[in-house]
Amino acid sequence: MGCCGCGGCGGGCGGCGGGCSGGCGGGCGGGCGSCTTCRCYRVGCCSSCCPCCRGCCGGCCSTPVICCCRRTCHSCGCGCGCGKGCCQQKGCCQQKGCCKKQCCC
């Protein structure tokens, strides 16, 4: 999957660089609770999913943060994911090095 509104970013987790803080363009489907793969929310009040790996998790924010995958978090025993409080202030997966050290429960 390509990036949405981010220029030349890769589709995989962690593939987006610093230029991915813009909003989503067309083709971003799904609501805030529907991301189960490596997707993140746009900066601001998120209303759709974006295939970039930088964006807003779990509500509104002014600074892009790195989201984690629900699947990766489950494998580390966290049980959280995008749309469930995944923001950079806390990190329950930090010691295990998963979820880009951004997962919080």
From Swiss-Prot:
Name of the gene encoding the protein in the UniProt record: SCYGR6
Keyword Nucleotidyltransferase on entry: no
Residue spans crossing the bilayer: none
Keywords linked to the UniProt accession: Keratin, Repeat
Note: Human have a similar number of genes as other primates despite the relative hairlessness of humans.
Organism for this UniProt entry: Homo sapiens
Role summary: In the hair cortex, hair keratin intermediate filaments are embedded in an interfilamentous matrix, consisting of hair keratin-associated proteins (KRTAP), which are essential for the formation of a rigid and resistant hair shaft through their extensive disulfide bond cross-linking with abundant cysteine residues of hair keratins. The matrix proteins include the high-sulfur and high-glycine-tyrosine keratins.
Family membership: Belongs to the KRTAP type 28 family.
GO cellular component term, pick one: intermediate filament
Spans annotated as 13 X 2 AA repeats of CG: 4-83
Protein name: Small cysteine and glycine repeat-containing protein 6
